[in-house]
Amino acid sequence: MIIDPHIHSRYSGDATASPGDIIRKSREIGLDAIAIADHNTLKGSILAMKEAKDLDEFMVIPAMEVTTNKGHIVALGITQEIEKGLSPEDTIDKIRSYGGIAIAPHPFVRYREGLCGYVKDLDIDAIETLNSRYIFGYSNWRAKRLATKRKIPEIGASDAHFLGAIGSCVTELEAEFSVESVIKGILSGKTNVFGNRTPLQLILKEVIKKKIKRS
């Protein structure tokens, strides 16, 4: 199974695509599953799940990207929202109590609210070691080194904020088409991550589009 477990919809506030468009793009490029992990809301994820419920060989995993008081954590597999501003430890406890797993996204990218040094001893379930915005950067290398050292499962994800970036980085794992199976597959540690950097021209194009939209 090939999944992109970190995509943003327009409900994030800093992205542009609708959940429906994200599903269509994801199927077009051959993904088996996605997670829409919007900032501090499940709205985009829940809407996508409803739209995808009757699709064959494709699934949407519920998720959100929670802002803790130390940085971002992706809550994968939850259907109850978690409030922002809690400590990472309390956030992780809530994620697990709701049946999900906690992933550290772009952990060493400070300006995007990564957990940075705080992640080193944190009881996290998986680490995003390949993020399409930083594929050649030091931050991914540090994330990979930490995951290897602590034997934490690795995640690859696009962190897409627009359609053209979806699937830029992905995670490959053995799983059935169920949330429980995907979570089990990640926790097994038997994941492969691969992909390419989101082209800079696409990032700049989207930044310009968002500025025009706000003006």
Locations of the language-model features?
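Charged catalytic cores and adjacent phosphate/nucleic-acid-binding surfaces used
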Residues: 1-9, 13, 19-25, 43-47, ...
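Active-site catalytic pocket residues across diverse enzymes, especially alpha/beta-hydrolases
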Residues: 52
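N-terminal beta1-alpha1 ligand-phosphate binding loop
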Residues: 8-14, 30, 36
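Ordered, amphipathic secondary-structure segments that act as subunit-interaction surfaces
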Residues: 85-86, 105
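Short glycine/serine/threonine/alanine-rich loop segments
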Residues: 31, 58, 100, 152
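Divalent metal-dependent hydrolysis catalytic cores, especially in the metallo-beta-lactamase
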Residues: 23-41, 101-103
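Aromatic-lined carbohydrate-recognition surfaces of secreted/lumenal glycan-active proteins
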Residues: 103-111
